[in-house]
Amino acid sequence: MSIPKAYLEHVAIWVKDIHWHIRFFREVFGMEMREVQGTAEEPLQYWTLGGMQFMSKPDFEGPEGRLGHLGVMCEDLDAALAAARRFEVEQMPQGFNWLSLPDGLAVEFIQACPASAVRELLAVNARAPE
């Protein structure tokens, strides 16, 4: 008997400033909106194509109880890092491709090989009705 395969569809995180996170993940990783609870102007929760779910919690303090880090596969590592550095982020001791966001979330940027794999994977929408 073979083991059924699965994959992680999304990661949900509490964020203090949901608009900042939406803008960062859109401008750095090209992650567009898949769904929103509330409105785009005043979202309570926001899901991206690419697996992120941001849950607005303006009084959220620090990374405790959130998660270790996000590993994000990039078509163009250098371009993604350049875009990220336009935001208030800090390089981490783990390496040039590890950045800490202002609220403490750690993000590891990874170069996809081949780069085209990112677009191929993002072209699949398993939630789309048949």
Specify the residue positions occupied by each region the protein language model found.
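Conserved short beta-strand elements that form part of the metal-binding/catalytic scaffold
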Residues: 31-66, 99-114
